[in-house]
């Protein structure tokens, strides 16, 4: 072959190689959704890192430099990530199932949290079950659900290391593959963050060594920064001047334009503010171990060669607030600090360092994990896969045009709690007035004729009374007038039905008298009942106008024998009727005690029968008012408990079962078979009574539960709790690791029983608002483009038509099921809502594009800080 032909061959080979390389380059970018063939696994590994109570608004991510370097600089940061409920167990249930709270029915951290109903209906349909059935090596490490007791291993997990109950860092119990494992307080062996990190790394390495071609799914669920905020010893001195939590809404209280708990929460006291500073510091310290954990996992993926074939997701179950709006700490509010969470994704085909403005939710995690694994997403999941949002959509050349902007949701539901009773049609007026105080509602009810009589009407259940302070109250009617209907019904039932359906239990050889015989024998022998005290009586309790007074007796009253007048229906002695009026002053004997008696956390009764309180109560009018209000609440609570106990005692006296006469065949036994209808159903009279008994038993169970809580608080000297409020007491013994709290105990309330709400959060190119409806009928609306920290409720600026349209949208979200119903698409903003309304009439801002939707920094809020005092 000559030189010219040789040169021609070389030139042809060069051109062919260039064309082939270009073709390979084009095909690589056009098919970038597919994984490279030289990887060991066809399907990628998935690692979900979940933290507990981690905020975004208070700057917790600012100190996690390792995590931000790995996830933010090396992956995608979703700047509009939210949860659909700011509660631990409901949010975690949504993460596992991909469903809204109203579809998995876990409304609180107690109700239906890891219950048998949850296990039967929803736990068998988590993302772990689907991936485990298709060959994934699944593993869970850390906190699961608040009420998980370790009695079983949830389905779908090959490796299970689950924390029992709520978050702890020391002295906890794990369920390791069905075996309970207790841990102590040794940092090197027991610190939970490090332990689950080491276990997860060991599991991943072992899986890749034994099953190199099987993908791995791991969930690493940290307890940090949840309480009790125990940090690792090496980080206990960091952040002495932490102040990221001091936002414009910090100590912004009271808020008369917001819902109930916000209106009655005043500014924090100095001890509360000092607590918030230390709490923020300790939370950041616990996150340092999570930061180390992320670096350890990253290095493990690099060493095993699985980094480029692994999706890593970092997020939290909900946010947190520390001092915002005067609330010392907590979550459960529908505001940004409680529903915004960190959300980072790193993995194949994810552009490094990008900011994604689309709304992502906790319900999107389950469908996203299924989509990454190549599985079909069940239609009953409410969330959507965000995998398509991670596609960079970069054009290959100028002839490859960019695709149309992806259609994505612009609104979602935020819900907490459920409405136990349906609202009546006549209560719609409460929404129009936005709020009707309780005293006003009671006052309106007392205007009705049926509540003005003193329980004299047949079937009357309530009466209106006025207490000593002139305050109107509704009291429940008790006695024959209210029970007339039920007693008339019970008289129609034969006597043998009162004995119940259970057979008598008789002891052989024992002869028992009838009820009349026992009473006759009791009176004849002057028998002393077992409940009569044999010792002298030194004081008696007298109830006057619903209040209980303990009156001391000068001379010890001797116990009396029971006489015939003690039985129901017997005439009272004349002496008892002429007792005269009772006076609570004078005639009381001197009482001496060895030590002062602690009545409240600030007041004592001394040996000389005088009361002594803290000096602050005598100097500060506000402290005096607060403590007096606290004592009034305690007295009212105890009085209600005593009334309930007396009602139960009276019921038990009337419903005492009669003993059986075992030597005589009763009429009930002889005719037992005749009294039943076909199909073994109960007699209709008895059936009606049985349904009433069930209702009564449910009420009794609730009363007993409240009584147990009351007794427990009294035993623990807990005088912090208020009726209808969720409160906590903090003292020097709460934190067992440095830095320690040394400023003494204090009480604070964080939420209320009526804090049930449904909200719609909307973010798009033109709108950025939150609209809420509370169970009390209260409405809230915040325009976050003009009020990013939700300082002012702007619901009064909206027209009635706009409110109605927002209400319709919210009701649709509250009842949605499946991703087709629960993900409303972006609407035409020129037309407003889909019903034809327009937002232009109340918008006070100009349209903004996505890059301008970022939250303003603290430096740009100088005007808000002027004149503000923390």
From Swiss-Prot:
Role according to the record: Exhibits arylsulfatase activity and highly specific endoglucosamine-6-sulfatase activity.
Entry protein name: Extracellular sulfatase Sulf-2
CC terms in the record's Gene Ontology section: cell surface; endoplasmic reticulum; extracellular region; extracellular space; Golgi stack; plasma membrane
Annotated Ca(2+) binding sites: 52-53, 88, 317-318
Positions annotated as active site in the UniProt record: 88 (nucleophile)
Ranges where the record places region Hydrophilic domain: 416-715
EC number(s) per entry: 3.1.6.1, 3.1.6.14
Principal location class: endoplasmic reticulum
Gene3D superfamilies, A to Z: Alkaline Phosphatase, subunit A
Keyword vocabulary terms for this entry: Calcium, Endoplasmic reticulum, Glycoprotein, Golgi apparatus, Hydrolase, Metal-binding, Proteoglycan, Secreted, Signal
Lineage per the UniProt record: Eukaryota, Metazoa, Chordata, Craniata, Vertebrata
PANTHER family, per database record: EXTRACELLULAR SULFATASE SULF-2 (PTHR43108:SF4), N-ACETYLGLUCOSAMINE-6-SULFATASE FAMILY MEMBER (PTHR43108)
Biological process annotations from GO: bone development; cartilage development; chondrocyte development; embryonic skeletal system development; esophagus smooth muscle contraction; glial cell-derived neurotrophic factor receptor signaling pathway; glomerular basement membrane development; glomerular filtration
Post-translational modification comment from the UniProt entry: Processing by furin produces a secreted form. Glycosylation at Ser-583 negatively regulates its N-acetylglucosamine-6-sulfatase and arylsulfatase activities.
Glycoprotein as UniProt keyword: yes
Location in the cell: Endoplasmic reticulum; Golgi apparatus, Golgi stack; Cell surface
Chain positions of site Cleavage: 538-539
Glycan-modified residues: 65, 112, 132, 149, 171, 198, 241, 561, 583, 608, 717, 754, 764
GO molecular function: arylsulfatase activity; calcium ion binding; glycosaminoglycan binding; N-acetylglucosamine-6-sulfatase activity
Modified residues (3-oxoalanine (Cys)): 88
